[in-house]
Amino acid sequence: MISLFLGSLQVYGQQITRMPYLQMLGEKSVQIRYRTNQAILSEVQVSSDGKTFNRTKKSSQTNTEHLVLIDSLTASNKYFYRIKLTATQFAGDSTYFFKTAPAIGSQEKFSVWTIGDMYPGPNQKNVYEGFKKFIGNKYTNLFLTQGDNVYGGGSDGDFQANFFQIYQNGPLLKQSALFPTVGNHDYDIYPKSQDYPDMAYFQNFTLPTKGELGGLASSSEAYYSFDYGNTHFICLDSYAWGKDNMRIFDGPSDQLTWLKNDLKATKQKWKVVFFHYPPYTKGTYDSDLVPDLINLRSILPKVFDEYNVDLVLTGHSHVYERSKPLKNHYGLSSEFNKAVHWPQSSSGRYDKSTNSCPYLFSTSNVDKNGVIYVVNGVGGATGAARSDAPHPVMEYSLAGQAGSFYFEIDGNRLDAKFINEEGSVLDQFTVFKDLNLKAPSTQTINYFDKLELAATWTGEYVWSNGDKTKNIKVNPTENTVFKVSDPQNCFQESFDIKVNPPLSIQNVEESINIPFESLTIYDLLGRKTKEFKQNGTINKELISELNPGLHILIYQQNGQEKSMKIRTNSY
């Protein structure tokens, strides 16, 4: 692969002034956007191995704003790409690749990085560098924002200098699918109207308005939804007025109606909602005092509770705050009652500290469920908390430090972390959904039988026999109870294995002329020595082929499995 760029790429007067970023990524397609200083044909070549670029998508007209649709892809596959500039010049190297989304409903593990309020300056750059230090060479599937993507007006120049030129340094924009949220500062110099066509935010991002990636069509790029694996993501605009001249917290707005219908329609295991204004905060804003936040809290959390949303990501307040699972709290902080509004009391940190077991959610029994609210408004901006901080719904609160929020979903497990500018984890929590631990069970096996046992959860394991894998194979010779737990003893399962008495040793004369439908012979170490898959008879001729010593014979007779142990001599 030819590698020909540093920052911006110039070839014969043609210059890539905005490096590629990924939009509308799904199971079978992705849109690659980039910008050049001169109008040229848009052309992207794609490879499945990074060596042979045998697929080309190009435009028929020249452009400076390039949007290339790559389709007919396969879910959960890695693809390399490069941008053609001239007949022999390309922008691209081995770091230019993406991975298509897993099939909807897939339990495949994926990762998400999120930031909010990216005020320009050293903090913003340090937050990104801290995340790169934390993540190392691991791939990040999705990149979400919580609004206020730029400051100083929200112009295209602001986006170019303080968004694209920051996050194009490293793998993120060229590898991870970007799904942003709009914040109040993105609207600064524009009418406060959703989908305003001249607004830089809406010009720079291509977002799913027609349900192309799952979810219901919103007919707006200000709010939308998409599916990724087993998770349904919803982005809202918590600031501007819609085409109905209403904001989402003004009453029965178009956006609120769409939100309810979209949540009602999804069948995904996990539900994640992200937007700018926080319903609960005691940071640089106070959700007890700001009218918009009060109005928003009176409406949105009720919807999230009704439709069992799992995680809500917000910004605006320039602190980091994270609640325990929260339920049925829509009033002032003084009205919060932990006995009523916290269905689970753990910190959720799952780090072996006191009272830190994971949160347990269920799709069938929702009484103990709640919504975890995260305020992540420190992607560049920071500030002091209110004098009465922390907000009582919060499990963890931090002011004066910039950072970002990262989470992974692996089947029925969600792990989340707040990462500071140095790449250190300051807060974390884990949620299991529909864990369904096995009740203690009893099973009877024959003396020679082998058995495979498996723990239910995804994570770490401590078995009573010393094993540390999820699945273990055992061959007990006496009644044994096998127990498994996680290292923190938050989960336990037990398997009571009853073992039939060992077979008595039979002489060869007692073991001849026994018909079988199939037969397998083992030595005493459990190694298979012979196998017969067709009807036959245990007789002198068959036994004469065995080495002298003890043998275990497992055979089918009249549809039943039988076994015996024999001793052979030279026959």
Cite the ranges covered by each PLM segment.
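Solvent-exposed loop segments of extracellular immunoglobulin-like
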Residues: T456-V462
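C-terminal tail/sorting-segment detector
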Residues: Q89-F97, L503-V508, E531, L546-Y571
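Solvent-exposed segments in extracellular or luminal domains encompassing
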Residues: K470-K483, L542-I543
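Acidic, histidine-bearing metal-coordination/catalytic regions of metal-dependent phosphoesterases
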Residues: G13-T114, Y119, K133-N137, K271, ...
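Residue-level detector of functionally pivotal "anchor" positions at catalytic/ligand-binding pockets or at interdomain
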Residues: D434-T442, C490-S518, D523, N569-Y571
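Short, glycine-anchored, charge-dense loop/turn motifs used at functional sites
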Residues: I521-T529, H551
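A short beta-strand segment in extracellular, disulfide-stabilized domains
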Residues: Q31-R33, F448-T456, I512
